[in-house]
Amino acid sequence: MDTGYSKWRKLDNAALAFPLVTGKNDTRVFRFYCQLKEEVNGEILQAALDQTMEKYPLFQAVLRKGLFWFYLEHRDIRAVVKPETEPPCSRLYIPDKKSLLFQVSYDKNRINFEVFHALTDGTGAMHFLQELVQDYLILAHPQADLPQIEHAEEITHGDKEEDSFSQYYSSDIPKDKEKKKAAVKLKGEKLVHSDMHVTEVALSVKDIHRKARSCGVSITVLLTAMMLCSIREEIPKNQQKRPVALMIPVNLRNYFPSQSMTNFFGWIEVGYIFSDETTFEDVLLSVKKQFEEELVKEKIAMHMSGYVRIEKNPFVRAVPLEIKKYFLMIGANLGSRSITAVYSNIGIIRLPEEYKEYIQHFGIFASTNSLQMCSCSYGDEMVLGFTSKIPNDSIQRNFQRMLGEENVSHRELKNEFPGYGEKHRLEKKENQKVIQTFSFLCLAIAVICGMINFMMAGVLNWFWFAGAGCACAWLVVMVAYYKRGNILKNEMWQLLLISVIAILWDRFTGWKGW
């Protein structure tokens, strides 16, 4: 099928490190969902997804590993709707597995759109979900004569897959020489693998807007200040002199015209060093000032060019990915030292007035290795999605207490996610026991083979082959369980490695031809 899109394209600048830093503890997946006022019909949702994919074939891509960079390759794989069974933000990108980088699922009244961040950002995901919900409701209610979202006709396929980072990059823009301080790090026992603690809070847009206006700030500034103060009460004593710092993603389309559906975002870092005398007003004024200083086109261009300058460096481009990946991972880890948590405000979701009869609210939250808050609003309801690797929800409670103190009406949403919660964790513990038992058996078999070999022959000869077989079997199972990697590829690498070792052994021990 000819979609008019490129058969392959390189990852945009913001996505370059995502495949490398994706792991069992942070999947780099975010969930955008729509809560309807009626139960979702899976067959109609599949038909709606088929229609939506005709408008967004850009998303019909798999992630491949090249010699120098990762890239996206178009594949004619049908996106299939599934009932929700996995925990939120479960892993979508699995190395060596040629699968789509997003998943549409449903549960009761909820339509979920989960996407790996290398494919698109929050703005791209929002447009896709808007289109999907529109197509679903039009099919589900043909008699309602619901209007369709209007699209600018002049937007081309090339516009949607454009790498806007490269378009607006300029080597003449000066470098950002600002040094970042190490920020407060939240302490506590973390959940393992893709498990995370999810809390959602719905609040009145009118109330939060009234409060922000009375303070002379935007809603984003107000919520950022409240988030900083909520974390303040949980600062470990040995980190009291460090700043509490939030990463705030910035939609670069607001500063540089772009219709791209790929990632096109930057970020600013907003922080505060607390003392015993600090008041909420002090934090609010500081945050407002930092936003005004950072959200200037010239400074944003400086940050953006800094990201791209590294990618464009001839030496970096010439280094193979297998070597480059270690430096990218180190860079990502060093960058996270100046961040305590993340706050991402997607903004207002707009649909024609006729759709309000069927939609309750929209929500968004993301996988994290620490703490993240996301927000979006529809009508008079803003939903805050907190995700945390630390099951203690004291920061979330602090935030809700502050909302009450500021007379902002709110309520905690009691969502039930299939595959999430204590039952899911117990199942994982049982799986862990099975894996531990298998590991013990592999070791025990190898030891028993060694004992039998020594008792019968007085030396260890065939034991080495039995031990290698046990090690290979253990490695295959571990890769399949923990990394969900390609088992056949793993076997091929093992065969190649064993063959090389055997040849070298034969060569340097004088044994010929075995």
Residue ranges and their predicted role:
Residues 488-496:
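Cytoplasmic-side transmembrane-helix entry/capping segments in multi-pass membrane proteins
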Residues 2-13, 107, 119-127, 131-210, ...:
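Non-catalytic, low-complexity flexible loops and terminal extensions
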Residues 1-68, 77-103, 233-424:
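Acyl-thioester-dependent acyl-group transfer interface
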Residues 496-503:
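Small-residue-rich segments of transmembrane alpha-helices in multi-pass membrane proteins
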Residues 449-479:
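Short alpha-helical packing/oligomerization segments
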Residues 504-514:
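Juxtamembrane boundary at the C-terminal end of a transmembrane helix
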Residues 422-458:
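Membrane-associated alpha-helix detector
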